Amino acid sequence: MNPKQLNNSYQKTKDDFQHYIDNVKRNSPWDIYTIINPTLIKNPYASELPKRFFLNDAGQVNNTVVFIKNLFKFYLKNTYLLVSYLMAFAIYKLYYKKRVRDELKIIIDTFSLVDNVNKNGEFNENYLTGIYELFEKYNTNYAILLRPCQFAKNPFKLRHFFKIISQDKRDFIFEYELLKLSDFFTLLSLMLLYPFKTLRLLQKEVSKEDKIFNHSLLADIKYFSFDSLTRYILGKHLSKIDSIEKIFSWSEFQVIERSFNYAIRKNSQKIELKALQFFLNYEVYFNSYVDDLDDDMLSAPHEVFVNGRYYIQNREKV
């Protein structure tokens, strides 16, 4: 299929694609395993489903073979990430002694590339430019919930990172501060169960769309995000802090945002989640669009702030 044919196929079947996924979501268990499933999230860069659906490609490999192959890769990769995360926790405890000065009320949830901070000698991200100055202008206290990124291959680079952040005058909070030893056993348990919980989503193969979905579902096990579980546990901890009123998050509504939202909304009725989508979006970046069904499943934020009127969606609940 050439690009023109692919585009024609997309235009003809894009509504069918959305309806199919929504139907699967409605009839699935609404728990963390469903919330973080990459096939249902429809990220074209982290799922085989969008491309296969529009190419009408059900795959040639037996689904059992696909599952076993990805199961082995899944456990190998995520065991490594769990060990790396445990090391990051230990490094945090050793090298980060700064504590939040003010009571946690407003949190700005964003991420930072560890290498960039280490190179520049300061935290200065370009995604939420202006929001810090806005809060400071109106004398509104805030804390930055910082997600260190791209350190898994070498957690020891976090030593310098934490030393740099310690020198910043602003309040910072890291997920490691809230972690307990039992959380690592929870992580391990969720991780071990995830591939088998995925099998609950397999559809009875009545149509070719069902075959495409099932093949993609099993192949997408390799796209599982370990961070989706750590963010889920973080959300549960934050939901228990009574002083928190609002959390502003940079959001592409990917799996890490969904699991975080789900944990907070399931366990707290008073924390307001504000998603900030200050980027140029495009139609086929399917995962970034928040639906009313996502709100029903508690994986959506309460409000989404977008980059202009063009991006405002006709939703009833979000």
Place the predicted regions along the sequence by residue.
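Catalytic-core helical/loop segments in enzymes performing group transfer/polymerization on anionic/lipid-linked
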Residues: 1-318
